[in-house]
Design a protein with these regions (language model features):
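Conserved small/polar residues in nucleotide/adenosyl-binding loops
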Residues: 252-254
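Phosphoinositide-dependent membrane-docking surfaces
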Residues: 233
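Rossmann-like NAD(P) dinucleotide-binding subdomain of oxidoreductase/dehydrogenase enzymes
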Residues: 1-107, 236
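ALDH superfamily catalytic-core signature
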Residues: 36, 71-216, 238-245
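Short, solvent-exposed loop/beta-turn-alpha elements that line the ligand-binding surface or hinge
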Residues: 222
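Glycine-rich nucleotide-phosphate-binding loops and adjacent flexible coil segments
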Residues: 229
Length: 254
């Protein structure tokens, strides 16, 4: 969605895909090859340290746009500031889904499930914090547990699969480590919290959809982006309290 408005404005674009997942952008470039003039959309695969740094230092760019970690995003922002050009940075999120007791229960369940499990939770705007009003907390969590456990995890091309693999082994280990961190902080695993290895999934980085309960807003699992199929559930009592919890983290603008 960053490409389309740039092209509509008459700009040329250089895209550096993520080092671990370059193929989709390369396939897109193949499709665009027969549609756009040469040089309008350019793909530069490679590591961030080499290809990414070359982009930051090249004088031919009038704007920088980055999606990724805060650490790298800081470098992108500094590079843009040095050259006095604009930069847009998407550096993660901890979006709050607020479930009130007068909600459309089924729609809220669907939204909470899809909000965190879409793309295995590897989305900047994943609904990773689920705030539930106290009067329906137990009922909602019980129903959401069933929803999570009904989700089919597997190879994306297989029928009925909703959740695929995480991007790599390193990311899977990071996400699982957050489950351990949550338990150490006092959270409970309502469902999931483990790697999936059955039915041939041992050859990939698959994880069971995970819900953590008994979470308080000050816990790391409620403060830090996990970037995986893990949602934390936080109980609230009043609208004012829910808004305060949601707004405490600046990464909630989604």
């Amino acid at each position: 969605w960053k490409l389309a408005p740039a092209l509509a404005a008459g700009d040329t674009v250089v895209i550096k895909p993520a080092s671990d997942t370059p193929l989709s952008i390369l396939e897109l470039a193949k499709l665009l090859k027969d549609i756009l003039p040469a040089g309008v959309v350019n793909v530069l695969p490679g590591s961030g340290r080499v290809a990414g740094q070359a982009i930051l230092e090249h004088p031919g760019f009038a704007k920088l746009a980055f999606t990724g970690s805060t650490e790298v995003g800081r470098n992108v922002g500094l590079a843009a500031a040095k050259r006095i050009i604009p930069a847009t940075l998407e550096l993660g999120g901890k979006s709050a889904n607020i479930i009130f007791d007068d909600c459309n229960f089924d729609k809220a369940l669907e939204g909470a499930q899809m909000g965190i499990l879409f793309n295995q939770g590897q989305v900047c705007c994943a609904g990773s914090r689920i705030l539930v009003q106290d009067t329906i907390y137990d009922k909602f969590i019980a129903a959401l547990k069933k929803e999570f456990e009904a989700v089919k995890v597997g190879r994306p091309w297989e029928e009925g699969v909703q959740v695929g693999a995480l991007v790599d082994e390193r990311q899977l280990k990071k996400v699982l480590s957050y489950v351990d961190i949550g338990k150490e902080e006092g959270a409970t695993v309502i469902t999931g919290g483990r790697r999936l290895t059955e039915d041939g999934l041992d050859k990939g980085c698959f994880m069971a959809p995970t819900l953590l309960g008994d979470v308080t807003p000050d816990m790391r699992v409620a403060q830090e982006e996990i970037f995986g199929p893990v949602a934390v559930v936080i109980k609230f009592y009043t609208e004012e309290e829910a808004l305060a919890i949601a707004n405490e983290i600046g990464r909630a603008s989604w």
